[in-house]
From Swiss-Prot:
Any one Gene Ontology molecular-function term assigned to this protein's record: adenosylmethionine decarboxylase activity
Reaction catalysed by this enzyme: S-adenosyl-L-methionine + H(+) = S-adenosyl 3-(methylsulfanyl)propylamine + CO2
Protein name (database record): S-adenosylmethionine decarboxylase proenzyme
Pathway: Amine and polyamine biosynthesis; S-adenosylmethioninamine biosynthesis; S-adenosylmethioninamine from S-adenosyl-L-methionine: step 1/1
One GO cellular component, as annotated: cytosol
Assigned EC number: 4.1.1.50
Keywords recorded for this protein, A-Z: Autocatalytic cleavage, Decarboxylase, Lyase, Polyamine biosynthesis, Pyruvate, S-adenosyl-L-methionine, Schiff base, Spermidine biosynthesis, Zymogen
Gene: speH
Active site (catalytic residues): S63, H68, C83
Processing and modification events after translation: Is synthesized initially as an inactive proenzyme. Formation of the active enzyme involves a self-maturation process in which the active site pyruvoyl group is generated from an internal serine residue via an autocatalytic post-translational modification. Two non-identical subunits are generated from the proenzyme in this reaction, and the pyruvate is formed at the N-terminus of the alpha chain, which is derived from the carboxyl end of the proenzyme.
Function: Catalyzes the decarboxylation of S-adenosylmethionine to S-adenosylmethioninamine (dcAdoMet), the propylamine donor required for the synthesis of the polyamines spermine and spermidine from the diamine putrescine.
UniProt record similarity statement: Belongs to the prokaryotic AdoMetDC family. Type 1 subfamily.
Amino acid sequence: MQSLGRHVLAEIYGCRFEVLNDVKKVEDIMVNAALEAGAEIREFVFHKFSPQGVSGVVVISESHLAIHTWPELGYAALDVFTCGDRVNPWDACNYVAEMFSAGDMKASEVKRGLMEQPEERLVANM
């Protein structure tokens, strides 16, 4: 079965407070993560919460990267969804974890838009 895209959900632990709480640093890291993965950036928006935390999204031609940080816990939730075969979402995840000086990253990949091939559909419907 063919998929339309790859969606990596990453739990990033042991990150530096000062990075996770700096909206400009998080924005720069996420934009560079998209570029490192070979994506084409369309636009991005990031928000700094009070007293701490950052959320943001980078819209790419191939889909998106999204992040939510909990600096007080040294934790970030990262979401990287890419369509097609040109961009590797794992490259973006690994880049972010490295730039956050993460102690650990646990991640899983989900295939999105699983599509049956026409010949598979015909056989399945008989």
